[in-house]
Amino acid sequence: MKNLILMIQFFTRIPINIEIDVKEDSFAKGISYLPLVGLIIGGFNAIVYFVSSKFILGTLPIVLALLANTIITGAFHIDGLADTCDGIFSSRKKERMLEIMKDSRVGTNGAIAIVFDFMLRYAVLNSLNKKYIIIALILSPVVAKTVVTLLMCFSVYARKEGGLGGVFVGKVKPFRVIVAFIISISIGYVLIGYKYVALLLITVLFIEIYKKLIYSKIDGMTGDTLGAANEIAEIIFMLALLSFKGCGLL
């Protein structure tokens, strides 16, 4: 339970004022609970959408749900996406890319990434009916948090010095990833059945491609690239869900 609380405190802005004795391996042990953290985030976003759609017509409830996601996560992962795009697409050497990613200022590539992140989410959600908007809002953070555990476990840390990503990358044991996937599949099966597994695997495939791109640039993962992976995974899952719905598979 302490590790779950630690993960909620780390990945969300939910005010849980409980002091936890954090050890060096506490974060790595807690990743098994990341799908549950995703469920909390997704559940909050879905509630905001559902309640607001009862009183507001049109697409504004979708915008409010996206705003809710930004608030509950503190824009934690989208900041990583912006930093990653600024660094990776800077056409510099590895060391300079890592320096750029560490810069708190948002560059052109980062700004474009943020805009397209929200545009893609909005476009996909606006293409779904109310039922599947709620499903997408709930499950996309669950899938993303699940898939990112693979990067934490089977990657090396790109920076020589420490950083937020360093408490996860290369520190996670495989069985904790297995537990995370079991929890994730259990959640997804309740909502959309066995087809969740197919959507999860599609997301894994695209994140593996993303990993190869990052490795070709900086030879490893950082906290920023993990955050970017989370954002990309959510969008990939939403796009896959929309495709399945369009093809009559859901």
From Swiss-Prot:
Pfam (any one): CobS
Segments passing through the bilayer: 31-51, 55-75, 106-126, 133-153, 187-207, 230-250
Pathway: Cofactor biosynthesis; adenosylcobalamin biosynthesis; adenosylcobalamin from cob(II)yrinate a,c-diamide: step 7/7
GO process terms (BP): cobalamin biosynthetic process
Locations listed in the record: Cell membrane
Role of this protein: Joins adenosylcobinamide-GDP and alpha-ribazole to generate adenosylcobalamin (Ado-cobalamin). Also synthesizes adenosylcobalamin 5'-phosphate from adenosylcobinamide-GDP and alpha-ribazole 5'-phosphate.
Topology within the bilayer: Multi-pass membrane protein
Protein name listed in UniProt: Adenosylcobinamide-GDP ribazoletransferase
UniProt xrefs under InterPro entries: CobS
Keywords, alphabetical: Cell membrane, Cobalamin biosynthesis, Magnesium, Membrane, Transferase, Transmembrane, Transmembrane helix
Assigned EC number: 2.7.8.26
GO cellular component: plasma membrane
Keyword Zinc-finger attached: no
Chemical reaction(s) catalysed: alpha-ribazole + adenosylcob(III)inamide-GDP = adenosylcob(III)alamin + GMP + H(+); alpha-ribazole 5'-phosphate + adenosylcob(III)inamide-GDP = adenosylcob(III)alamin 5'-phosphate + GMP + H(+)
Molecular function (Gene Ontology), one example: cobalamin 5'-phosphate synthase activity
Source organism of this protein record: Clostridium novyi (strain NT)
